[in-house]
Amino acid sequence: MATGRPATGFGWRVYGLGVVALSLVCLAWGGFDPGQAAPKALPDRAVLAFAAAVFMVVAGAAIEWRRTTAWAAASLTAYYALVVCVLMDGPGLVVSYAEYGSYSNVAEQLAIAAAGLIVYATDAQINAVLAARLTRLGQMIFGVCALFFGGAHFFYMNLTAPLVPKWLPPSQEFWGYATGFGHIAAGLAILTGVQARLASILLTVMFASFTPLVHVPILLVDVRFDLLPGSAGIGFVVT
């Protein structure tokens, strides 16, 4: 039996707006999202980057309109999973398979695909059993991604710690390790289903706190494309 289900909370709206914001910055900068590792020598790279950004604007905006939410989410899922993770980031992962950062970078893009899958499953007019399976698949994928996010904090503490405000006690390293552990704990909870909803909510709060504490202060000094916030919407969707 096909049934329509409301998308998780208001996470689908945050998710859609996040995609739109990211795509608008891509248009302003005239390039791909840094997580989309399109080769520099790619023919007509600027044109393709523009096309990708326009697609993301349209799809992200379509998420906000309930009549097109499901199809827009499906389109974003396919784009991030197949085009970004496989075609763009896949070759780099094969070449740099021994570097942890290669996996965490792919995980960042895969998490966006996982959130799109969950939005699609919870909104589309599809069989309830299939919807539940797709939702769980998206949650499992995101759980694995969270493990990679946490691991990156430990592997690259020399890069993570300086992002923490110096005024935040007890130390930058403490919060670097604490947030890394938080990612891993949340990922395990989501994967096992033990206190998964609580873990997702807390992870969302942590993602959201990164914006005023980490991203905004850095962006005010150094406008870096790769520091644009966008994880909170994904956390909202997973909850």
Predicted regions and their residues:
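Membrane-interface interhelical connector segments
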Residues: 28-41, 155-175
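Extended, low-polarity transmembrane helix blocks
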Residues: 1-31, 46-58, 62-155, 174-181, ...
